């Protein structure tokens, strides 16, 4: 595919996720430079590498922005606290309580007048019958004084709520203080008629605006009068005095401009008036999604604890939806353009109803009733009463949801059985790789599968019909063990054949090492003086039937070709070894587990990756090295399962007494330079036991392709004698 078409395709894919073409092209240039114009890594898994790069930078910018905002906010709070302290220092000291009526009224009148001056330009007066005045009326209207006691009666406060910087609806607060009640500085709470939040006039209410009542107190409230804050960008409906209750609107994600059913609550002065200089967010419950019939609903309850409400605010549902979709995209790689968190929750409600209707185990006779007033008491909102919310009982706990989210098929449906993965230790997930059920050539490896490569003497094209193992006479595919095959009728390795392979791998007295005149591993280092060959272990191999044979796929001599069939699981080990592979069922001795899958590389290609500091998981196919006088570089092959592979990449190392052994298997070609590397059990294995094999690593060889590491296998035959103190501590705990 031409580069321009690939760039256009990548930009189109990012546009579906709301990422601009300019940003996409900028990150593509960086990635192409990093991967040396290799598009394969960029395009795999629906541009995961590109998405990770974009969102990682976005997270970094967001973190820096939040840090700057916090510093700015901190400076503003310090400035505000200094100004408040200065103003309080200039205030006149309070007079004794025993004074004449005029002095008492002056003391009571002072904070009310100052409160009006502090909001000049935003507040206007209003009559006791709720009729509003304009600014001219406010300027020309004289103050009326009571001739009997000389007390000034203040009109009710009226403020305009700003919506996105524009003046909006008025909030009126009545001053019901009578001369007799205000002539003394009484410390008893005064009864105030309830307040009501009326629906707004036909105006569009944006979801992104705040939908909670935030109570702010600028100074200590000594007269126990209700103080209503002017929240600037608050989108609350008009606040008036009346005899009905407050109605708090609930916002729906889809119907942005339609108000849902209201939740009623009574507000008393003790609960409505802020007693400190902190912002306090009232407890809230928001309906996120529901089924079509409304029988099942998903609600979000927000009730911050006392002392933890500083700088908290209720986010809008639109912001929550976007944040959740971004999290699903980053954490779970959900890139489908039609995916929606809202749709997912609605489907969950529908599924719950379907299961409830189809369930025959028991009827829904019990329901959990949540008293929202208790939640209000716990959050510090004393005196707030809400209707009871009925929620159906749910048996899934938090740990249950974690287990469900971690149980996934890591094979992506490529194998005969599902292989789940789970992490019960921390929040890590398996590293990214492309799952493949078969090995493929990367570039230069001369691996060719052709029918002509097999002669009639090398296959059973004429002698066998269905199952070679069921035949009384051994065919050309036999290898000379017992009746000619390595497998039993049960699909296990024969005892004699398996023990021979174990002995040649572990018993130095029975090992046969072959030495190359010029070892491909040394030649690939590109040094002037080659090191002598360190030797390659000769291994016995299995020969399976193939397409040219007359038998069927069910032939007993096609065990590796039929693939995995055991119940396995990838898990995070608790002993510091990272990810591992374990069995979920008991396995007999000689059972096939899996084969090592990866990219088929030449040794020079593998060393090139090492020179470029690219991570690798190599396995050298050297079972027949040394049998030729000179092995050409392109015929010396290996497998690398780092970027493309299967579950064998999770198998950990164990020195000498591992419960798995690797055996070469010839299938598609008689050429001994390439073969399958299959893993079989060396003994009976219990369920939940970790599977491991001996990497054959020399811990004293620093020039090896597989770099030495601190071995944590725990075997008493461990070859890593020079362990660090940290390694010994881990082994002792295990």
Swiss-Prot record:
Subcellular locations according to the entry: Nucleus; Chromosome
Which stretches does UniProt call biased (Basic and acidic residues)? 62-81
The record lists its disulfide bonds as none
Q: Which residues bind Zn(2+) 3?
A: 464, 545, 551, 555
Composition bias (Low complexity) maps to 123-132
What highest taxon heads this organism's lineage? Eukaryota
Q: Where is the composition biased (Basic residues)?
A: 113-122
Q: Name one GO biological process term.
A: methylation
| PROSITE patterns linked | PRE_SET, SAM_MT43_3, SET
One Gene Ontology CC term in the entry = chromosome
Q: Tell me the residue numbers annotated for binding Zn(2+) 1.
A: 460, 464, 468
Q: Where does Zn(2+) 2 bind?
A: 477, 545, 549
Q: Which Pfam families match?
A: Pre-SET, SET, WIYLD
Question: Where do the annotations place Zn(2+) 4 binding?
Answer: 655, 711, 713, 718
Q: Which keywords label this protein? A: Chromatin regulator, Chromosome, Metal-binding, Methyltransferase, Nucleus, RNA-mediated gene silencing, S-adenosyl-L-methionine, Transferase, Zinc
User: What stretch or stretches form a coiled coil here?
Assistant: none
Which SMART domains does its entry note?
Answer: PreSET, SET
Domain (Post-SET) spans 707-723
Q: Does the keyword Metal-binding apply?
A: yes
Its function, per the record, reads:
Probable inactive histone-lysine methyltransferase that acts as regulator of transctiptional gene silencing independently of histone H3K9 methylation. Contributes to transcriptional gene silencing at RNA-directed DNA methylation (RdDM) target loci but also at RdDM-independent target loci.
By what name is this protein known? Probable inactive histone-lysine N-methyltransferase SUVR1
In which organism is this protein found? Arabidopsis thaliana
Q: Which gene encodes it?
A: SUVR1
